[in-house]
């Protein structure tokens, strides 16, 4: 029940002061005035508090349990980060203040970008983008600006592997590029021969995730970088899966020219349900002149925003980006240290391989062998044998108090499930998840209707996805 349906005429949660208030009628012309009052819900304060408390209790988050969404890195978010982000020295400042009066905030941003440059092997970094896809668009605008600065106007094509995130081709298209798909080999890696066949003087960039969305490391990345650069194009790194390689190898060492990161994923700021996020973009030195303004610099013991980049693509976000997300990532990096970040990646890979080994006993893994931080289940044979879809399995997982993995992505595997356990889960949790999944597989064979009609214990049961898509209801009519 939505809060509007709980409304009782005349019930109030407030009382206006007795003194006469100045009427504002003269401010608005007649055609802008309402002819009848808004249909706002009328409830008492306890009604409102109980309504939203009940909704909060129905929510699921990583603080409640296992959240193995593949390609999302739903790791635990340390509460130390939240404490620091709540300090009034950070929450009570304003971006319009003179920069001399916010030296602490500027220091945080400067040191964070230096940390991120060190982690990625880049030379300069902007912290402006508000999310991963926003970072992609920023990066692709830099690619365009670079080629135009060389009067290389023929380069209008962005190459994107078929295993890429869906936002990669979308971001490239938004930046004005024509997108061409590169097929993967049977092993799930970039097809070098096909890549070579596509490389010509019209190619602007190859967008790549490494490890890729199958959880596989592109072992030929050095060759790929060489071929792309020989063709005069740039190599773009989607940092969605950086959690697998921190402290082990840097994208800059692989040959990437541009990197975008997801601080809300890899560096532990809470995310999901639309944000807030942060998608910094790092570049090699020869691309730094195109970064958005301002760049945070240091002069002696003073920090300042530098707007003097004549070839900049301009602002891509108001002010300095999502500052409190930047702050949480900064605290995370400081508390973990270099060795801690390396250990986090090691444990992320270990957990993924342990869980993969358990699940491989009763479900097919799309790419046999060692994976990185995540892996993909190929459920096509399972569906043929049982008539139960992977979507049904995901719905049934909810009945066991767990969040479902990502389903039907990447698109190159049919009836698939992408599982990323992250480094913050213990062996007991992984064992329990594997047992739940095995039990559901048995249910699909013996009592398939139980799985097909799941979930059964959640506040909201099986939704009518088709009607919701074709006839969405976006708002409640207030008048």
Swiss-Prot record:
Cofactors per UniProt?
pyridoxal 5'-phosphate
Q: What is its EC number?
A: 1.4.4.2
Top-level taxon: Bacteria
GO MF assignments: glycine binding; glycine dehydrogenase (decarboxylating) activity; pyridoxal phosphate binding
Tell me the GO BP annotations in alphabetical order.
glycine decarboxylation via glycine cleavage system
GO CC terms of this entry: cytosol; glycine cleavage complex
N6-(pyridoxal phosphate)lysine is carried by which residues?
265
Keywords, A to Z? Oxidoreductase, Pyridoxal phosphate
Which InterPro entries does the entry link to?
GcvPB (IPR023012), GDC-P_C (IPR049316), GDC-P_N (IPR049315), GDC_P (IPR020581), PyrdxlP-dep_Trfase (IPR015424), PyrdxlP-dep_Trfase_major (IPR015421), PyrdxlP-dep_Trfase_small (IPR015422)
| CDD domains membership | GDC-P
Matching entries from SUPFAM superfamilies are given as: PLP-dependent transferases
Q: Write down a Pfam family by its short name.
A: GcvP2_C
Task: Check the record and name the Gene3D superfamilies matching this protein.
Answer: 6.20.440.10, Aspartate Aminotransferase, domain 1, Type I PLP-dependent aspartate aminotransferase-like (Major domain)
The record lists the catalysed reaction(s) as: N(6)-[(R)-lipoyl]-L-lysyl-[glycine-cleavage complex H protein] + glycine + H(+) = N(6)-[(R)-S(8)-aminomethyldihydrolipoyl]-L-lysyl-[glycine-cleavage complex H protein] + CO2
Question: What NCBIfam families does this protein map onto?
Answer: PRK04366.1
Question: What protein family is recorded?
Answer: Belongs to the GcvP family. C-terminal subunit subfamily.
The cross-references to PANTHER family, in alphabetical order and at most eight, read: GLYCINE DEHYDROGENASE (DECARBOXYLATING), MITOCHONDRIAL, GLYCINE DEHYDROGENASE, DECARBOXYLATING
Fetch the HAMAP family from UniProt: GcvPB (MF_00713)
Main role?
The glycine cleavage system catalyzes the degradation of glycine. The P protein binds the alpha-amino group of glycine through its pyridoxal phosphate cofactor; CO(2) is released and the remaining methylamine moiety is then transferred to the lipoamide cofactor of the H protein.
Question: Assembly and partners?
Answer: The glycine cleavage system is composed of four proteins: P, T, L and H. In this organism, the P 'protein' is a heterodimer of two subunits.
**Protein name in UniProt:** Probable glycine dehydrogenase (decarboxylating) subunit 2
Q: Which organism is it from?
A: Pseudothermotoga lettingae (strain ATCC BAA-301 / DSM 14385 / NBRC 107922 / TMO) (Thermotoga lettingae)
